[in-house]
Amino acid sequence: MTDIKQILTDLIGFPSITPEDAGCQKYMIQFLEQLGFTCQQLNNGPVSNFFACYGKIGPLLVFAGHTDVVPVGEVSKWDTDPFSLEEKSGVLYGRGVADMKGSLACMLHMARRFIKTYPSFPGRLGFLITSGEEGDEFNLGTPYVMQKLEQQGIVIDYCIVGEPSSSLKAGDVIKIGRRGSLSAKIHLSGKQGHVAYPHLADNPIHRISPVLAELTSMQWDNGNAFFPPTSMQITYIHCGGHAGNIIPGELNLHLNFRYSTEQTDESLKTRVINAFTHHNLNPAIEWRLNGEPFLTNKGILLESCKQTVLEHIGTLPELSTSGGTSDGRFIAPYGVEVIELGLVNATIHQVNECTSLQDLNTLETMYFSICEKLLID
């Protein structure tokens, strides 16, 4: 029988740089169909997606994840071939071993073991997998699949996202939510001119400066028990001109909010627009909502996960909402209890990305135990 390490070896061998799947999902679908899962591919443009389900009735527990990985960077800086799993003293190296093909290997191995142990369990076990998580095509992935499932009347009760949530060892941190992300591209027009004749020009840098001073000093909220205060960061400023004696005629500015449940995207938009209005400016603003904040601070799923972690590593997990966004933001709005439980994130997106064989085994065992608590007990 194929063990976790062999499954991970197979998955790492697919060079699935986002949004390419490169054969990962074909492998996973064949694996799951052999167990009796019904699989449907829901590909969308360059992004590969599939949903798989075992069982007909009862609560539906879905394991969600992504097969795509970030680029490897300079291959010469790796100590190993990034697309060939290599073990050194119990540590496994390869692009995606932690984020998140290691979790996928644990999910597959667990599913086979669970179905063999409980072939007629009173519930349903599912997989929601995309190759569009790491790049700009995320809207073609999980949110698209969720729309399709809603159209089919498929309701998910619980979802475990296999993102690398842990800090020092598998299970020590569970993500119970994530901040929202809102971006803005702002264009302010002025009038180009010579610096010696400012009265004949209109400098957009000068005009926007008091607005930026106001926005960067603003206390958006105080956060709450689960989230830090909302933050805003300016990520890009560019002006025309490109010469020391030219007043630029236009300005482009990008900013991003990471916001708590104390805010909505509309409340943030209003405050930004009001700041510009206060200074008699009316720029063109293009907004992009990357994801709303979500929080699972109670419920059967969270309690089952907390108890499972305590049983397997001897301590309760830290419950956190830190870090960037995840695809959980597209699943939670459908009323699903969502948590993230995965491997250690210390080396994700880095050269020599790695995880330990011990953590893989621990995570697989925890996934199995959670399934028992939710679908058997």
UniProtKB/Swiss-Prot annotation:
The residues that hold Zn(2+) 1 are: 66, 99, 163
The family line of this record is: Belongs to the peptidase M20A family. DapE subfamily.
The keyword Transcription regulation belongs to this UniProt entry's keyword annotation: no
Positions of Zn(2+) 2 binding = 99, 134, 349
Q: Name one GO biological process term.
A: L-arginine biosynthetic process
Q: Which reaction does it catalyse?
A: N-succinyl-(2S,6S)-2,6-diaminopimelate + H2O = (2S,6S)-2,6-diaminopimelate + succinate
Which pathway, metabolic or otherwise, does it act in?
Amino-acid biosynthesis; L-lysine biosynthesis via DAP pathway; LL-2,6-diaminopimelate from (S)-tetrahydrodipicolinate (succinylase route): step 3/3
State the gene name recorded for this protein. dapE
Entry keyword set: Amino-acid biosynthesis, Cobalt, Diaminopimelate biosynthesis, Hydrolase, Lysine biosynthesis, Metal-binding, Zinc
Give the active-site positions. 68, 133
Please name the GO terms that the record assigns under molecular function. Answer: acetylornithine deacetylase activity; cobalt ion binding; succinyl-diaminopimelate desuccinylase activity; zinc ion binding
Q: What is the required cofactor set for this protein? A: Zn(2+); Co(2+)
Reported EC number(s) for this entry are: 3.5.1.18
Taxonomic classification:
Bacteria, Pseudomonadati, Pseudomonadota, Gammaproteobacteria, Legionellales
Give the protein's recorded name: Succinyl-diaminopimelate desuccinylase
Oligomeric state and interaction partners are given as: Homodimer.
Classification via NCBIfam families: dapE_proteo (TIGR01246), PRK13009.1 (NF009557)
Catalytic EC class: hydrolase
Q: What is the native source organism of this protein?
A: Legionella pneumophila subsp. pneumophila (strain Philadelphia 1 / ATCC 33152 / DSM 7513)
- Task of the protein: Catalyzes the hydrolysis of N-succinyl-L,L-diaminopimelic acid (SDAP), forming succinate and LL-2,6-diaminopimelate (DAP), an intermediate involved in the bacterial biosynthesis of lysine and meso-diaminopimelic acid, an essential component of bacterial cell walls.
Among its keywords, does the record have Metal-binding? yes
Record's cofactor remark = Binds 2 Zn(2+) or Co(2+) ions per subunit.
Recorded superkingdom:
Bacteria
